[in-house]
Design a protein with these regions (language model features):
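Short linear sequence motif anchored by a di-proline
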Residues: 1-275
């Protein structure tokens, strides 16, 4: 599961890096503790509509805010989005909530890295036989080469059925992070991690004319050289009220709960790299 991440790049940086045509004005600022249901910067492509309706044939790449937590087009209310922050790679092409978006509305969700919480082995019982509550240690996972983590996502455009169709506020753009079985450093901390779009596959991944699910899935099977690294961070990240660069600072080793390599989930055989 990916339930928290950091995204500190400016719109200018993202627009240049991903060769964006249109940059929306209402993009969020740097966020070091991105949580579900907030707006996040996303890159996607849309066909330009003609003034009188219809497809002009032109495709534009956009950098725009999407609310994290996908609301399917058929949903009766937007609250369902808080339960749709992740789409599993294994079922994204078939699951009713995600299949339609996966066919034609794929996106990139740029990140500095993501957070996961490691739960150590249960502590010894307290006096009286009461079980001690294990203390979860947050870790920050990022590219070892310092590059941007380009998470694979899907997005949907939902209209509030109770609102006037011509009311701009009736429309909501939402997204979900595609996740896969964790490997490498992530596999010792949590069993899931975000799926990454390889740089050479970005153009094809965003192409709205690519509607074959199998072809889209194949794009995500390509890996790049490099690996994922993880380090312990302060429990301050546990609260979404905390949001500043200090959340990314490594915790001194004397304060971090070590990850037990013998009891932590191992990376699947032959899958030792994320990027």
């Amino acid at each position: 599961m990916c339930g928290r991440y950091a995204s500190s790049a400016s719109p200018t940086q993202l627009a240049e890096e991903f060769e964006v045509d249109d940059v929306f004005d209402d993009l969020p600022g740097p966020d070091y503790n991105v949580a579900p249901t907030v707006a996040v910067p996303a890159v996607f492509e849309r066909r330009v509509r003609q003034p009188g309706g219809g497809d002009s044939g032109e495709v534009r790449r956009r950098l725009a805010p999407l609310v994290w937590g996908l609301v399917p087009s058929w949903a009766k209310e937007a609250g369902i989005g808080s339960r749709m922050i992740n789409a599993r790679l294994e079922t994204v092409a078939e699951k009713p909530a995600f299949a339609k978006a996966f066919r034609a509305r794929r996106c990139l969700l740029p990140a500095d890295g993501f957070y996961e919480w490691y739960t150590p082995e249960p502590a010894p019982a307290l006096p009286g036989g009461r079980a001690a509550k294990p203390c979860k240690q947050p870790f920050f996972l990022h590219r070892a080469d310092g590059g941007r983590l380009v998470m694979a996502g899907i997005y949907e455009i939902w209209r509030n059925p109770a609102a006037d169709r011509d009311d701009e506020s009736a429309w909501l753009r939402t997204c979900s992070v595609i996740t896969t079985q964790a490997t490498d450093a992530a596999g010792h901390i949590h069993d899931r991690m975000p799926m990454v779009v390889p740089r050479e596959a970005i153009d094809a991944w965003l192409d709205p004319s690519l509607t074959d699910p199998e072809q889209a899935l194949a794009l995500l099977s390509v890996t790049e050289a490099g690996a994922l690294e993880a380090y312990a961070v302060s429990t301050a990240v546990n609260s979404v009220q905390n949001n500043d660069p200090s959340l990314l600072e490594p915790l001194p080793e004397t304060e971090a709960d070590p990850v037990d390599q013998d009891t932590a989930p191992a990376a699947p055989p032959g899958q030792d790299r994320l990027l």
